[in-house]
Amino acid sequence: MNASQLVAIQVLLDNAAFAALMVATALYWLAAAFRRVPLLHELGTGASAVALLSVTGLLTARWIETDHFPVSNLYESLFFLCWCVLAVHIAAEAFARQRLVGVFTLPVALGMVAFSSLTLSPAMKAGGPLVPALKSNWLMMHVSVMILSYGALMVGSLVSIAFLIVTWKQKDPELRGSSVGTGGFQKAEYTDSESTPPAGSMLSSLGVGGSETTVTLTSATATAGTALRRSNLAETLDNLSYRLIGLGFPLITVGIIAGAVWANEAWGSYWSWDPKETWSLITWFIFAAYLHARITRGWQGRRPATLAAVGFVSVWITYLGVNFLAQGLHSYGWLSGN
């Protein structure tokens, strides 16, 4: 298979990934609006899998074409980041069995593909040989691990943002089962001072008989059921975000260390306060504070979720923002169009 055929395959898979993500995003939003139609969510999951396979095929074709791991320019790295987000999303959804995850993650993945496909110039999309500075075995160790960490941290932060939206009317929701050693995703009890007591206790206090009592009990039971569902949803989102960020943090730590070792080999210095290095350290501290607060201070709920939302912005600044706003050692091959 020659280079032109590989390029044609990449264009086809690029379009397929974009179309699949558009369909998946629409289906997940429809599934959130019409919860009684489970087929919508199943179709959305299938479309997400098609998108993941399309991106996998595109990256594989680019790897064969260029004979190196496809993270040497912005186009390749965006698709690899999209692959990471989709893979983490599908795994998290299967693990937590929570349909709401895709409502937040898939629009982000769609935005990545749309930006790389519709905004970048043909020169920035084209594959080619590595520049001398990137011809190192550290390329895959550093860059791929960093982007993997971005994917996990982004999805974890998006789940935290989902938690903030779900609980925005509750001042201080009480959660259990989200900290270390509390049982993972086991169904936890939820108490809220504003919640309606269970139907059984209301029945004993109100007695039986009388249409007014029956109507009141039915309404109160429905309210309690809605509150319980929302509580279980908040519990799952808080739990899931904690574990995803716990997965991404070691990856970004390893990626930063690998980058420092590579920098010492290439330029004789472990750390040069390059803009991307500086922001990666800021991002590391944000998520280190998140995990420290949860593990040692027992933070749960809105406070760590707010910190994770700040981390989501910091990840984007680290990955993309500094390439637009500053020049440094990490700028070549990303926005230079080489």
UniProtKB/Swiss-Prot annotation:
Q: Which cysteines are joined by disulfide bonds?
A: none
Q: Which keywords does the record carry?
A: Cell inner membrane, Cell membrane, Cytochrome c-type biogenesis, Membrane, Transmembrane, Transmembrane helix
Q: Which Pfam families match?
A: Cytochrom_C_asm
Q: How does it sit in the membrane?
A: Multi-pass membrane protein
Q: Name one GO molecular function term.
A: heme binding
The Gene Ontology biological process terms listed for this entry are: cytochrome complex assembly
Classify the main location: membrane
Localization annotation: Cell inner membrane
GO cellular component assignments = plasma membrane
TM ranges are: 11-31, 39-59, 76-96, 100-120, 145-165, 244-264, 278-295, 305-325
Which family is it part of?
Belongs to the CcmF/CycK/Ccl1/NrfE/CcsA family.
Q: Subunit structure of this entry?
A: May interact with ccs1.
Reported function: Required during biogenesis of c-type cytochromes (cytochrome c6 and cytochrome f) at the step of heme attachment.
For this protein, the record's HAMAP family field holds: CytC_CcsA (MF_01391)
Protein name according to UniProt: Cytochrome c biogenesis protein CcsA
Name of the gene encoding the protein in the UniProt record = ccsA
